[in-house]
Amino acid sequence: MEKKPFVTLDQVKKMAASYPTPFHLYDEKGIRENARKLKAAFAWNPNFHEYFAVKATPNPYIMDILKSEGIGADCSSYTELLMSDAVGLKGHDIMFSSNVTPAEDFKKAAELGAIINFDDVSLVDFYEEIGAPFLETMCCRYNPGGNFTLHNEIMDTPKDAKYGMTKEQMKEAFTKLKAHGVKHFGIHAFLASNTVALGYYPKLARILFELAVELSKEVGVHIAFVNLSGGVGIAYRPDQEPNDIMAIGAAVKEAYDEVLVPAGMDDVAIFTELGRFMLAPYGCLVAKVLHEKHIWKDYVGLDACAANLMRPAMYGAYHHITVLGKENEPCDHMYDVTGGLCENNDKFAIDRMLPKIDIGDYVVIHDTGAHGFSMGYNYNGKLRSAELLLKEDGTVKQIRRAETPQDYFATLDYPGLKDEK
């Protein structure tokens, strides 16, 4: 799959005249088209609902776009709940899935009428102790343990994950919730991250559908929905094939028809909590080349760093890089593409073949629309970059300004720092 930026050099030059690099840029047209494609893939399920994983891109302007496409919010913290409330999401348009949950988070989620997803059976008792109200619809998170395999390949290791409950704990939690007057129940699980295998969702769905039938019979509860959570990934590398969400939706339907329908449970809704799939390809980090260095290797240094995009430094993750204006030139130079942090892992690419790069060139680092800005930080006194939205009509809107030194010092009460520009 060829990786092409959704923005041109001329567009970036115009943006940079008003909003200096580095900045994260999002493509409204791509976001909307992808949201509609996801909904089409699950249109066979009348009550299908996507809850965007706010942690992936916590910006209310992005959430507003998704809300207008009928998409809710998957929240895991108090501040994410506040953001969802601010954009007008309430009630069953919010899923609250957290772990090690503070009392105030549970209370806020209940106040908003969100669907609360309990990560552990002990949290049901904790919820009662803090005096939070039990709602008609509540959910529990399942962890089957062991290894999660697909086509004899280990995709992830739920046995090592801190999330979710065992099957027996699910039964105990459902029994407790039923005693508290809960009438409708949901089952949730997340068993693998960033999968590009078409079989992930269908296999997960089958596991959860079978559990739903078992819990419905043994505990005597109404299973209202199965939440497949996230885990559907994207093709970060040009040689990867992107996920076919239409094929995934069809395969989930096949499992639904084979497991739930014969059990008389054809009213079960399908929920998803996609973050990366929804946003990553429709965001990029735009940066400018500041310096080049030639010692034992050839380096190009950008005005962006790992504080703007942590994934390569933290995970060794691949992000494709395009040198704007040189898309058709041969990639015959090998570079390490770096930022300016005092850390040797502050590298966006290592031994990457690219066109000859010159100081002043603009580069696009692809697929940063999820877990890009949101994982930013202030190490080395670096400041978080702006976020811009390329609107459908071609205009650009700043949806978050860049931080200033004054922002960095805002929580310090120390003479001489408050007024730094």
Label each region the model flagged.
Residues 1-136, 171, 177-179, 183, ...:
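A charged N-terminal "starter" segment
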Residues 31, 55, 77, 109, ...:
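Conserved, mostly hydrophobic/aromatic
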Residues 58-61, 83, 102, 125, ...:
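Flexible loop/turn segments at secondary-structure boundaries
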Residues 72, 95, 117, 139-141, ...:
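Structured core elements
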Residues 132-147:
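Glycine-rich, aromatic-flanked loop segments that form ligand/cofactor-binding clefts
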Residues 144-290:
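Active-site loop/helix belt of alpha/beta enzymes
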Residues 260, 265-421:
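Charged (often Lys/Glu-rich) extended helix/loop segments that serve as interaction or gating elements
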